């Protein structure tokens, strides 16, 4: 299960590469919605199934 502070991977369909980021928030709205920061100033929002836990 993904938790705040975990390092996750996302397979970016636009750049055809894998991007790694840190989970900054988890929201429960009919499922788990996860905010991830990839090193820039804003977080991106994902459904849990689109992310893989690395560490």
Residue map of PLM features:
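Basic/aromatic-rich interaction segments and small domains that mediate binding to polyanionic partners
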Residues: 4-52
